[in-house]
Amino acid sequence: GILRRGVIEPLTRLLPASAGYINPRLAVETFLRGAHAPAWERVQTLLTSFTPEMQAELLARPDHDFLRRENLFAPTREQFEHWPAGPSPLARAFHVYARQFMLDDILVKVDRCSMLHSLEVRAPFLDKDFAEYVARLAIRHKLHGFQRKYLLKKAFTDVLPPEILHRNKRGFQIPVAAWLRGRMRPLMEELFAPERLRAQGLFRPEAVRSLVDAHCSGKADLRKPLWTLLVLQLWLRARGM
């Protein structure tokens, strides 16, 4: 609405574009991007690297049927809406995260890597009976006000020291934003060369250039879409494309 476009979004642009794990500006921009959408689309907005608008701008042929907005978000919408009546939107969001983000991302990367080094990161909590029990718990036991993992922290109050129990989340994210502006920029420039992109026929070179310039100048934090494009280009190069 007028408040979001006229006040909140201009104020958001005044926030610094941090390259760290926590980027307040990126978090607010991501939230605003999905704020007007249905709940299931807001969930997808948090999971995806590209909005449908970004895809339409980037792709050389954005008119494919499977790239239509309703088709892009169809799996998330189906998982979100085809639940028995009753669960809250937050409970449905947890379900989608477990079905998509955990299975196709976190377990594939973090947990395989940690188990390679004999570390148990998440697997003990994925015991079938335990996971089903936790899934049935009321949301208030998982999110208490703004405190996440409420019941888990209560259970470990007499086991872990307060400085461990209540410290801020420390994710496994690598410093992609800084790398793309520094040590990995030559590789990015090589893989995103206009002649290379034109030969592939997948992406519009000028649209990719716009993302690179906005990120490297510090005007925006586009680590997620640029990293996704970079990994795809490395995959294509490994296959002679």
Model-inferred region functions:
Residues 1-12:
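A mobile, often basic/glycine-rich helix-loop segment
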Residues 19-241:
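Adenosyl-5′-phosphate
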